From Swiss-Prot:
This is Benzoate O-methyltransferase. It catalyses: benzoate + S-adenosyl-L-methionine = methyl benzoate + S-adenosyl-L-homocysteine. Transmembrane segments: none annotated. The gene is OMT8. It is an enzyme of class 2 (transferase). Mg(2+) binds at residues 184, 270, 272-273. S-adenosyl-L-homocysteine binds at residues 18, 59, 64, 106-107, 145-146. Belongs to the methyltransferase superfamily. Type-7 methyltransferase family. SABATH subfamily. Keywords: Magnesium, Metal-binding, Methyltransferase, Plant defense, S-adenosyl-L-methionine, Transferase. Its EC number is 2.1.1.273. InterPro entries: MeTrfase_7 (IPR005299), MeTrfase_capping (IPR042086), SAM-dependent_MTases_sf (IPR029063). Benzoate binds at residues 25, 167. Methyltransferase involved in the biosynthesis of methyl benzoate in response to stresses. Utilizes exclusively benzoic acid (BA) as substrate.
Length: 385
């Protein structure tokens, strides 16, 4: 599995596309908007850059990037207003006006065509609206893994990444498809039957990747620059108890059913491990501290959202099951299919896609009928001193 080559969200605008099934991420972007706005205002007020470089890492091709761009622009306009200074050109004071360069980054397989069509449509829509002036801004794409260097040293003022850093740069070292015998039989992530030694391989891959990510971004950030990072995690320290564990265990069970039906070779399943890991807040804080880098943590928090991206109910302690598990299971299946499609097709072939996620939907309905499960999200803001 070559993650840089193979991994991307489902393209286009159809029923199964990521752009049509990313509402959960959209809700989270709104949930963390105050965090982004605060970071933008702090960077602007402290540095007063003439050109402010803002990078969205793992932008995908859904509407969430447009929400992020809008949030940054409105925050700059508000910060400029607080300083009694218009954010865009005019008059003799142009040397003090900021221009923004947005850099939208994702892997080369991302649907950048759809992304930039959406950006252009937003440009046109915004041009026809009366709103407070915002600074001039420019948008470019950068197809590359964020586990590589992306920018010159000390050139970026703000990094943003939403629902990406749970993904690893590769399958855990030691679990590659070519290795025999299979060490994580019938599983594709950390499950109840995963041995502690295999769970440790997933943890170590996260530690390696996240430490590298911090190092690279530290080199690229200006002093006083910030990173707002939002990603899936787990709510306690038990590596076997995360919400992702339950979710991907159901995907594995769906694939196992295809093996029993003769649609998938058992060896194929045994050689498939997802490049993913949901850390705890404690693990994240420890890696930031261990890095020895000049990062201060402005904020770190976690919050939960229902598996069903269209279920916004708070779900108090008395509500333990989903009221309409059949409907919710369809929404969950569409979301996970839009995320995993490229990896499943690359490894098992497109012919199994419908059968796999039909069975997954059935399993999710059964699960949600017994237990209302939530995603745990970690949100953090780091400042480079």
């Amino acid at each position: 599995m070559d993650i840089r080559r193979d991994f991307h969200m489902a393209e286009g605008e159809g029923e199964w596309s990521y752009s049509k099934n990313c509402r959960r991420q959209q809700v989270a972007v709104r949930e963390t908007r105050p965090m982004v706005e605060t970071a933008v205002k702090q960077v602007y007020a402290a540095l007063l850059p003439r050109t402010m470089v803002v990078a969205d890492l793992g932008c995908s091709a859904g509407p969430n990037t447009l929400l992020f761009i809008s949030s940054v622009l409105s925050s700059i306009a508000a910060a400029a207003a607080e300083q009694c200074k218009p954010p865009s050109g005019g008059g003799d004071d142009d040397d003090h006006h900021v221009e923004l360069q947005f850099v939208l980054n994702d892997l080369p397989g991302n649907d950048f065509n759809h992304l930039f069509r959406s950006v252009e449509e937003e440009f046109r829509r915004a041009a026809g609206c009366e709103r407070a002036p915002h600074p001039p801004y420019y948008v470019m794409g950068l197809p590359e893994s964020y586990y590589n260097r992306l920018f010159p040293r000390q050139s970026v003022h703000l990094f943003h990444s939403s629902y990406c850093l749970q993904w690893r740069s590769q399958e855990p070292e030691g679990l590659e498809a070519w290795r025999k015998p299979c060490l994580n039989e019938d599983n594709i992530y950390i499950a109840r039957t995963t041995t502690p030694s295999v769970a440790k391989l997933f943890q170590e891959q996260f530690q390696k990747d996240f430490s590298l990510f911090l190092k690279l971004r530290h080199e690229e950030l200006v002093h006083g620059g910030r990173m707002v990072l939002i990603f899936l995690g787990r709510k306690n320290e038990d590596v076997y108890s995360g919400d992702l564990n339950q979710l991907f265990a159901l995907v594995a069970t769906a694939l196992q059913s295809l093996v029993l039906k003769g649609l998938v070779e058992k060896e194929k399943l045994e050689s498939f491990n997802l490049p993913v890991y949901g850390p705890s807040v404690g693990e994240v804080e420890e890696l930031v501290t261990r890095s020895g880098l000049q990062f201060s943590m402005d904020l770190i928090k976690q919050f939960e959202m229902n598996w069903d991206p269209f279920d916004d109910s708070e779900g108090d302690n008395d509500v333990v099951v989903v009221e309409d598990s059949a409907r919710s299971s369809v929404n969950v299946a569409k979301l996970i299919r839009s995320v995993l499609k490229a990896l499943v097709v690359r490894h098992f072939g497109e012919a199994v896609l419908d059968a796999c996620f039909a069975e997954f939907r059935r399993l999710v309905a059964e699960h949600l009928g017994k237990e209302k499960t939530k995603f745990t999200t970690i949100a953090m803001c780091l400042k480079k001193e």
